Amino acid sequence: KEKKLKPTPYIPQDIEPVSDSDSEFKYLEGKTIKFLGNIKSSLIAYIKWLAKTYNFEADITSDYDKITNLDFRKFRYSDKYAAIIAGPMPHSVKGKGDYSSGLEMLKNEPGYPDVVECVTSEKLKVTRTSINKALQEVNYKLMSR
């Protein structure tokens, strides 16, 4: 009688442990981070898990139409958000003025929270790794204040 082997559970290789001292995210605690961009539902779940684990609030807008109709000017001079983490999004959004995109306006106009882009291979792309890197950058900026 042949013995059947139990399948080993799948462990994704692309997940980097968030355990080294740089990525403790302790300066995010109690803060609200705005996530804007095309974000897959599995990554939204990951962001929510990070928020719960590291005690920060994640305000996520990932729907293309909602981003297009979101007036980015509402983020100006608002102390609601500690930072904005941006992924790929439509160029044309409400309130972008003469800028080529809402993201350009957020990065260049005074009075907006820090904007950190989720970048993979020099392109805006939301992945677990780019989320972790963006949160590390936000954590560092908050620590430096």
Name what the model sees in each region.
Residues 101-145:
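Ser/Thr/Gly-rich flexible loops in soluble cytosolic domains mediating phosphotransfer, phosphorylation
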Residues 77-79:
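Alpha-helix C-terminal capping/helix-to-coil transition sites in glycosyltransferase folds
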Residues 1-27:
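Short N-terminal or domain-adjacent regulatory/targeting segments
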Residues 82-105:
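Extended, charge-rich low-complexity interaction segments
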Residues 29-32, 85, 112-114:
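Short, surface-exposed connector motifs at secondary-structure boundaries
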Residues 7-11, 62-70, 92-100:
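Phosphate-binding glycine-rich loops and adjacent basic patches that engage nucleotide phosphates
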Residues 39-43, 65-67, 86-94, 122-125:
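Short acidic, S/G/P-rich loop/turn micro-motifs used as interaction or catalytic elements
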